[in-house]
Amino acid sequence: MKRIVVDIETTLGHKTIWLCCTKDIDTGEKHTWYQAKAFQEYIADATLLIGHNLISFDAYHLNSLWKTKIVLNKCYDTLLVSRLLSPSLEGGHSLAAWGNTLHTQKIDYKATWQWLVGRREDYKGECYDKPHMGLLAVYCERDIDVTALLYHHLVAETEAQKFSQESVELEHTVAAIMSKQERNGFKLDIPYATVLLTTVKGRLDSIYESMQERWPPYTVERVSEKTGKPLK
């Protein structure tokens, strides 16, 4: 068994992967990868890849930019499972929120970058387009530490709350479909949709008229207590 926590750091527009950090949750072994080939070889025999927002972000961009072949049935997305277990979790489901809960806080990368370079960003996200690579690696490594802790917590909670493996898998399947729709959109039969809209509006008008006939509107006359005259 080889279960690996994965986290990537990219440019603001996600066109380039700067680095990828991994952690074997069974051995504790960590790596920071800067090249696709070595990373591809490392995860080739992984039985499980774990990440926070793994399906919509990390796995998608790794497959697109580093040409990995990450498949859905080998993914465990801690963000999805967190939402499954507690949809209205106080504080939210972000890795930063979980870091506070698990007493292993995320690093404030932006603030630290600004301190290191001695200025504020010229535009939002500049710290990712022009990263301090040493800081970025440390930041990413902390993220995989938090994600590893969160994975163990969620596995225990899933068992304690008696959530089935089927429910977890279904959540991942639906998330993969939704993520694809968000990126590519979806086809819509516009002529049919237009006809359907007209039909529904006609039906609503008919229902409204029937309700007016059954419960006709009436006016309540208000009278002034002082003068006894009708109020306008």
Regions found by a protein language model. Give the residues of each.
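Short amphipathic alpha-helix with an adjacent loop that forms part of the alpha/beta core around
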Residues: 37-45
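Active-site-proximal helix-loop-helix substrate-binding element of RNase H-like nuclease domains
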Residues: 14-18, 22, 28-34, 47-158, ...
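Conserved "right-hand" nucleotidyltransferase catalytic core of DNA-directed polymerases
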Residues: 1-14, 101, 117-232
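A general structural motif
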Residues: 1, 45-47
